[in-house]
């Protein structure tokens, strides 16, 4: 429990979200299970995003938090979220003390429009036990390290191209180009790499849209992910959906256009599947990014790696080496660019 509370704090690293850490501490003190606390936090965060992006009109969740009693909140909350996607509507046996309910009210003061939706992946990751992390090779990638990859691979190059663009015609071409770029994370987890790539491209596209008559927000359909965990894949889809909806609201406000109806398909192309047994050529992408799972000498890796390394004596290297080989094969067959955040060597145990 202490690890979960610390994990949420360390992964968020945002002083404005101290109140969220405080709520976690109180929920755990109320003897709620870690799984129930995690599910509730994800639902709570998603509800705030729904209010910020216009999915919930009239801020019904905020009104529920502010106007309900601690004893009645759990049942009324379940009624509110019944219409959400199935993963977000998961019921919990939640107990709230008056003190915990008061701590929740403080979250209503936060401007969630300014909070990165990758926080959802951080909450999910923080709740995983050490044994779960070892079993799946799952490791949280900080936003700093995410940008070490995507800035070098994608963003910096596009910024250079943007700075060299002079005429209105060239800017219009760049605007169209930014809308067609596709990004692929074959070990996407909660979606940090895809979310940050989307936000970077969307920000540049918003700047390039000046002078263009018909402007549309960036679609998530060109953001592809593979993930073995169904729960992590659901979180990735949900976070991408929230990200896209917040960006759509930003576009609507800047260009003074009506906010379009909710499109539930705007949640990326995220597939729950074993990436090493999947044919990557079924996905058309310009850039490959990510942090492959690391679990050296793990028994479950044998089948995938035995097939992948059938022509070599490399089956004893770490699971993450499979992603490196698959990425190399993928790039060799097509003109694509790849940068993965992995261990210093596929035989080492720490990432860098």
Model-derived features: positions:
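Non-catalytic, well-ordered alpha-helical scaffold segments
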Residues: 18, 35-43, 75-78, 101, ...
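Short, basic/polar, glycine-containing "phosphate-handling" surface segments that engage DNA
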Residues: 1-50, 54, 91-121, 130
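Class I S-adenosyl-L-methionine
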Residues: 84-172
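Ala/Thr-enriched low-complexity intrinsically disordered regions
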Residues: 350-351
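Generic structural signal for hydrophobic core residues of well-folded globular domains
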Residues: 27, 44, 48-53, 68, ...
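Short helix-capping/linker segments at secondary-structure and domain boundaries
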Residues: 50-62, 133, 160
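Extended, well-ordered alpha-helical scaffold/bundle regions in very large, multi-domain proteins
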Residues: 54-79, 190
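SAM-dependent methyltransferase catalytic region
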Residues: 132-343, 347
